[in-house]
Amino acid sequence: MNLKNIAAIVTGGASGLGGATAQALAAAGAKVAVIDVNVAAAQEMALKIGGVAITCDVADADAAEQAFAAVAAALGPARVLVNCAGVGNASRVVGRDGPTGLSGFEKVVRVNLIGSFNMLRLAAAEMSKLDALDDGERGVVINTASIAAYDGQIGQAAYAASKAGVVGMTLPIARELARYGIRVMTIAPGLFLTPMLRSLPAEIQQSLGDSVPYPQRLGMPEEYAALALHIIGNRMLNGETIRLDGALRMAPR
């Protein structure tokens, strides 16, 4: 897909993987909607790339519908959706005070899995009504999972489950949407230098980077963005999850 003047939505687009992707899409000629719960950061990113900023809880059905309507009004209907919005927590199933509460588990699954599906379903419905481009293509959806979907560590039950759900829905949805010319892909990043990791002490960042076989460092958000753009440009990539992790396999803890 040629991205020039194509409307694209990036959730979690104010920073990190989403921020790098929003910038890369804009540099490729796309009209980008930055969706994020951080209003100020979303506005700053939108101003930087010449896009629009929209505040939205991705797991809220009504808010998401309003966000898509706002994007269509400002940029036209989107042919590209990149889901980068996500949260994480660390909690053992059984702790010193007994079983962990459900609220933390529910929040992570709600944002990471339900939020991704919510945005995908609305994007797909909109894309299915658009005129077909080359090869009958109408749109591309890229979800973000994690290597935790495969190598979840102790304390990552909620996060790993939510990301495994994203991986699990990729193929069946891609098969379903194939009739419309809509592709669905997922990227499963390893250890990337996102705002969360940037907040850690330098020695911990170095230790985490050293655990990656090659390249022996943390991934850069721009490398995620580069893969997202490659997926958009290569129509044979469909229904698959790509690990972007430098051959890293996480230890139990």
Question: Predicted segment positions?
Answer:
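C-terminal substrate-recognition "lid" of short-chain dehydrogenase/reductases
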Residues: N2, M220-L244, R249
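Canonical Rossmann dinucleotide-binding motif of NAD(H)/NADP(H)-dependent dehydrogenases/reductases
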Residues: L3-V32
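Catalytic Tyr-X3-Lys loop
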Residues: V87, G98-N118, I142, V166
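Conserved mid-core segment of classical short-chain dehydrogenase/reductases
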Residues: G88-E106, A125, K129-D135, G155-A158, ...
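Active-site helix of classical SDR
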Residues: L120, S162, T170
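Alpha-helical segment proximal to the catalytic Tyr-Lys
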Residues: A125, A174-E176
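Short, small/polar-rich loop/turn modules that mediate ligand/substrate recognition or access, typified
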Residues: A178, R183, L237-E240
